[in-house]
Amino acid sequence: MQTLISGWSNYLNKYEWTHTATVRLHYKISEISADKITTSLVRYKPINYLFYCVENDRYDINHIHLLLNAPSTIARDSIAKGLGKYSKSVSYFNEVKSNKAISWYCSKQLNLNIPYDLKFKEQYV
C-alpha cells in the first residue's frame, strides 16, 4: 500500500501546485458529492487543474483536501464560489510553499479506499 501513496505523491509532485485548501461541510461528503463540487470548481474560470481527496475525520464526518493550479490572485472566497458553497466551508486556504510536501500530505491516505481524482479544465470544456 505504501507504493500507492509514494507513487501518487511522486506523480502529483510533477505538477505545479499554487494553492491548497481544505473544504469542510456540515454533512458527510459522499464520493458523488465530492466529484460534483470539484467538477464545478475546475470549470470555474481561474482554476486550471486540481487534485482532491476526501479524508475521514474522527466523528464520522470528512473533509476534502484540494491542490490547485490557479493565478496567484485567487482568494478563499473565489474557491467557495467555484465550489458553489459558502465561504466558511473553505476552512483552510493558502499558497503552496513546498510542492513535494503538499503532494505527500494530500496523498497520505489514498490506501484507505477514499475518493480522489485529478481533474483538468480541458476535460470539461
Features from the language model and the residues they span:
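Right-hand nucleic-acid polymerase module
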Residues: 1-62, 70-125
